[in-house]
Structures are given as structure tokens and as C-alpha cells.
Amino acid sequence: MKKSAALLTALVLTLSGCGYAEEVNEKKFLIALGIDEGTEYNVRATFVFANPSDSGGEEGAKGSPGSDKSDILTVEAPGIFSAVKQLNRIIGKTIDMTHTKVIIFSGKTAKEGIGDYIYSFAAARDFRPNTYVCVSRCSAEKYLHKIKPSNEISLEKYFDLIMKKVSSDRIDESYLYYFYFNLADKTGGSIVPLVDINANKLPDSSAGKNAADDFGINPKAGELVRKAENKTEVCGSAVFSGGKMVAEIGALSSDISKMIMGEFSSEYFTLRNPSAQKLTSVLLSQRSAPRIKTEIGDITKIRVTVPLNAKYVDSAPPSDAELAEFENYLSSVLSKKGNRIIKRAQTKYESDYFGFNEKLRSSFIDIPAWNSFGWDEKFKTADIKVKFIVQVTDFEELNSGEAMKGEN
């Protein structure tokens, strides 16, 4: 009995050892990967690594690609995992990709098709399912070299914050796993953030003001009017049909698309109030999930109702008549723009990135029946209409605030 206990103890101690484990200093932790088309080989891959000594606090920005201490390497190879193998030979450490925040494809690569990359990443299981996928309007290598986050955050934190800001707090289309599922389904599309470098300068004071409101401008990454040390920005979206990028859409189109998809959180808009003849600021937010009704036939009919809340943030609330007119105005404008976006997706992009396929699929008894339905073709001619219903809320606080001012 004592011999058995001793043998068991020896086995436990042996199996719980770390003889085959790698130490942290034997690894390089990847936080961003850029993929461009190569000149010598098929793939030009840019790897951005975390710098453990600069991973937090005020020194975090020392690890940014734009600094002298940047930990960024670019290699060309026949394939992405061949590039990883080459990199191992250069740095002498094992590359750990499980902490990667974002994978950035150049627009040229995305137009050629990134399906093979997505399938490879999913099969290899080296990346986490919630790794973000983006498309750069310039080369991915150039974009990664230009990032300069503010001094108080590390590069890892910057990617985490900026992607969460432009993405949804619900199921996110820009996650690697969601892109993979859409790709495998073959009946839907995908929409991911668009990034670029902004070379613009603030206009001269004599240039005059643009009279447009937020419903009249639709900027993409690289087009914002601003001045900052960090020239990179995330704005708008890349639309995919299958594994190929088929379009770029601006920030407003992206927001309205997410409202239709039920993935919109909240955002401030400055709009021209038709009744007050002035610019009015509101906080638009998704009141509840969109209500979708479907009718399957020779021409599939889909009706979408999108409930939104609008919080009036100007100093004084409007009258009841002005309020009703403003609600109708918001509902009407968003409905018109939403229907145009859907029609463009049907006829020009041929991409159901809204996820209508998921709603329809539940009506079929099994996958073969769904596949034989042929939604990828039927989507192009389907009768799809969206209606926005905007309700302005939160006037109690404003009214009580005005009353308190009057008493004083």
C-alpha cells in the first residue's frame, strides 16, 4: 500500500511539472497583424508585438509602432503561416497569437478575397474568436506604422478601446468568428470597420462654413476634418459578399445599417430641426431589437420596424407641436435613408450583411431545405422595406431643470 501511495505521489508530481512548458520570456505576444499583397511573395505580413515592460501606465505608449522603441516587423512569404515561421527564425522566440486584438487587411487584399485567410485562422485556432477584423484603405503596413496612441494608454489598450467604440455591445459582425460563420453560410454578408490615415488639415477660416448636418455628411476613414498627432482613424465600414470586399460605406450608412441589424448602441447627432430652423443635438439609441416580419413566396417579403429613442440635449425642450414634427422628421429621414441602403445592398453589393438570412433560416425544417431555397439569389429581388419609429424622451429632467432656474 505504501509503495502504491509513493508511486502515485511520484506520478502526480511528474505530471504536474512544467518541464515542457515555455516561459513568458520565450514568447512574443502578437497584438496586431496587418496583411498586404506581397511583391516578392504572395503575402506581406506586418506583426505588431506587445512590449511587456511598456504594457501599462504612463509609459505604455513607448510600445507604439510610431516610436523608436516600436516592436514591429514585416516579412514576405508564400503564406501567412510561412511568414510566422520566418519570423520565428528572425526573433528566436515562439509567437503567441492568442492575445491578438485586431487583424487588418489592406483594401486591395480584401477586394481580391480574404476567405482563405479566415478559414485558415479558424482552422488553426491560434486566434481568439473575438479578434476584430478590419480593412485599411491604405496598406495595412503603413497604417500600423502610423498609429500613435495617447501617452496614457498602451497600444494593446488603444486597439481594445477604439474597436469597442466603433463596434457594438451586442453580437459583433466584425469578430473573426462571426465573419467565419457568415462565410461558411454562403447566404449572408459581413460588415467590418474601415481604417485609414488622415492627411487632412483643418480648413482656413476664410473657407466658409459647411451648412450640412450629420444627416448630410457620410465620411469614411481618412476623411474626417480634424487635427491631431495620431493621424489614424476608424470610420465607416467595409461591406463583404462572401470573402470579397464589394464596397466601402460611410459613417452614417454604417450607423443606419447597424440600427437595422439591431447592433446600434447610441450616438450623438446634430441635425437641422425643420420646425425650429436651427441645428438640434440629440442622442439616438436603440430602444429595442428591430421587429422583423417575413413572408416567403416567389418574391420574399420582409418588413422591418426599428424603434429608436432620441434624447433631446439642447438647452430648452421644444413645444409639443415642435416635438411631434421633429419625431416625424427623424422617422421619415431615417426610413428613407434605410430603404436606400437596403436597396443598394440588394442591387449593387449583392450582400445581405443585415442578417435577414438568419431570420428566414428559422422558417425551414432543416439545412438542406434552406440551402435549396437559394437566398443568395432571392435576396437580390426580395421586397424589403424598413420603417423607423423615433420617440423623443427624457424631457422630465429638462423641464424640472428649467423650473429650478425659474425659482432661483
Annotate each language-model stretch with its function.
Residues 1-5:
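Bacterial N-terminal signal peptides that target proteins for export
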